Amino acid sequence: MTQPPRPTRLAQPTQPTQLPWPPERAEPTPPPELVQRAQPTPPLPPTEAPAGRERARPPQAPRPVRAPQAPPGGRLSPARPLRIAVVGGGPGGLYAAALLRRLTPGPEVTVWERNAPDDTFGFGVVLSDETLGGIEHADPAVYAALREDFVRWDDIDVVHRGRTLTSGGHGFAALGRRRLLRILHERCRALGVRLNFRTHAPPAAELARSYDLVIAADGVHSATRQDCADVFGTRLTTHRCRYIWLSADFAFDAFRFEVAETEHGVLQLHGYPYAPDASTVIVEAREEVWRRAGLDRLDERESTRRCAELFADALGGRPLRGNRSQWTAFRTVVNERWWHGNTVLLGDAAHTAHFSIGSGTKLAMEDAVALADHLASCLANHPAGHLADHRQDRSSVSEALAAYEAERRPAVESTQRAARASLEWFENLALYVDQPPRRFAFNLLTRSRRVTHDNLRLRDAAFVTAVEREAELPPDTPPMFTPFRLRGLTLRNRVVVSPMDMYSAQDGTPGDFHLVHLGARALGGAGLVMTEMVCVSPEGRITPGCTGLYADVHEGVWRRVVEFAHDASPGTALGVQLGHSGRKGSTRLMWEGMDDPLPRGNWPLAAPSPLPYRRGVSQVPQALDTAGLAAVREQFVAAARRAARAGFDLLELHCAHGYLLSSFLSPLTNHRTDAYGGTLAARLRYPLEVFDAVREVWPADSPMTVRISATDWAEGGTTADDAVAVAAAFAAHGADAVDVSTGQVVPDERPDFGRSYQTPYADRIRNELGVPVIAVGAISSWDDVNSLLLAGRVDLCALGRPHLYDPHWTLHAAAEQGYTGPGAPWPLPYRAGSRRPPTGRADGR
């Protein structure tokens, strides 16, 4: 039965009777707002909708905008003031105009907006504490007006199959988009900004000739950006879901996520209040679900009615309303550069971030603060902030624009990475709906990797404890210190020392370096310690310094390493990774020039196709014929037998990073026309033959894993869908887990680097196939490990560089979390160091 929402917990704002500022200084009366009337153009679809801020640390306010001062004892320069054109009258453009006009003495600022003053295509806007701190420093008057209208709340409700799970301590603030625009309109008028509504801006090239600075704040469909897309290096990505932006005439009492499981598939609702009597409601579904449900055939009125029916419980039976709302697919905008000459992109014109992580309004207003700050610095270098010489003008403006982009780009790219993770989580929502309810809620809250296990515990310890209890974690046991079983091997914890090439062998023979290196990591507490890629033949080495298992002497030395680890750190498992370099072999040691050919002493290379790794630089490999394929397969078998006799606990087949078996899998490196090339099934044939041959001689009770590159990060290469098919094939042939890496297959790849950036690929394989996965790639903290495990995205986490920085990373993680259980036992000789050493007191006592 439909239930009305529970009583609101919102703070009720007071409604100001007027905006809190008089004109700041005597100004000439600005020209009329509507200097040029034009027919309104059809509105564009909404490009973003706000969502909950995900905060991992206390907010830090940006620097205040600096107003340049006249030289001591000097007079104002008679030179003309700066002339600034702003294309687009959304919040970002308006706020930039107001901030720039506040510079002393103020530039001439003109804004063009093609729509009417009250036209807006969304409802509410969420701004974070960080953004509000920047606004307060940059313009206290705007902050004071916003503060009067904000509604605030702390909770997130996740509704999963009829159960509402609430997590508190998050902290949100929102207000209506129309109210925000009104505040900014009045602020611009008070400061003397020229506002032109229902008016198309002149072409950007024309503006650039007559103005010192042109700010393109004209949104995701920016005409300014499109006119110079090649200069800005624009990349547009349209995503898999359709969404519609609606409103309800009541206030949710929390940020609400709700899932509707229908005969057509899964749809989701994102809802939050933006006024005491109004909420934003966004309904979203994958494209195929949207079409199967017939939503693609409905107009705005029918779409609104249908969405209200789908989420009647969430709405308490109330209706929804639109505002020229239409279904659209979110588009991510990325630009290689944000400015050209004296024209700069701001807000959605420069970058977009999916509404499930943060609003474009938030990013645009932060852009405005940074741009005004750097332009103030530019003007401070000129007498009284005026510009006189045209060439000097443009040079100084260019310096300011370069500084603006340098400051903002890292923050924006970080937000876009988090937004990409979040939107992909919602695209794949159907993979998670069968999770237990609390795990599902935890997974949703940590989807972007910005909110973590430890951070969420700080916000709502009771919620995290309930999630851990549902997952049947032993009391006081972090997720990373729970055991995991692979075939006959039980790992004492979920931490893996990732394979890392050391380039320190002689003729394939490991030495004392490897004993100390791997022995130290075994003593450091990880559940599984992996060797570097161990090569199956002399010709299969990457460099002369790579280890092998192609000679009896190798077997004996590896046995010494394994026995030391087992004896010195009982419970540690040692794994060997077997591989063949393929076309990436016969190169220098990494620190001498990675992927550079040897200057002398080269050996012949083999690959599926005669394609060099770096055209014109690398050696051209020989395409393997039938005899060559059989010979390499037997080399893997012989190395596996030696690995078993050496006592390794686990064997991993290296089918990633562009080495031999990987280059069979990728269409970019496999151009064969025989049975081993063409379709994905054909490209899989040889790696599977090698896997089967190794599995046959590897002890039946010992696990085998396979490492794959889940994407080539290059057009025409392996895709995420391909990776699922590859993982499924290896699992069907007996792989006990898939080690999911990415890239390094072609030199012109474009990886999307970032914190734990490869884990979504592992997540999808695990939850789509039910196959255990090892996640790897920029996982650097124990908090990340706990978050990924408790959310059910991965089974094991492999860390490389953190274990180079700290061989005892796992034991130190246990000490920092106060864990002393069986998942991380300290070796007896080290037990005295199991507590963090005391540090000096600040008072010197």
Predicted regions and their residues:
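Extreme N-terminal leader/targeting segments of oxidoreductases
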Residues: 1-9, 19-21, 34, 46-84, ...
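C-terminal helical "tail/cap" subdomain of flavin- and related membrane-associated enzymes
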Residues: 74-81, 143, 376-472
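Conserved N-terminal helical subregion
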Residues: 75-82, 129-245, 463-465
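Conserved mid-domain beta->alpha element of the FAD-binding
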Residues: 86-99, 215-216, 326-421
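Glycine-rich FAD pyrophosphate-binding loop
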Residues: 101-121
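Conserved N-terminal glycine-rich FAD pyrophosphate-binding loop of Rossmann-like flavoproteins
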Residues: 116-134
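Conserved FAD/dinucleotide-binding core of flavoprotein oxidoreductases
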Residues: 163-170, 176, 191, 253-334, ...
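Flavin-dependent oxidoreductase catalytic cores
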Residues: 460-845
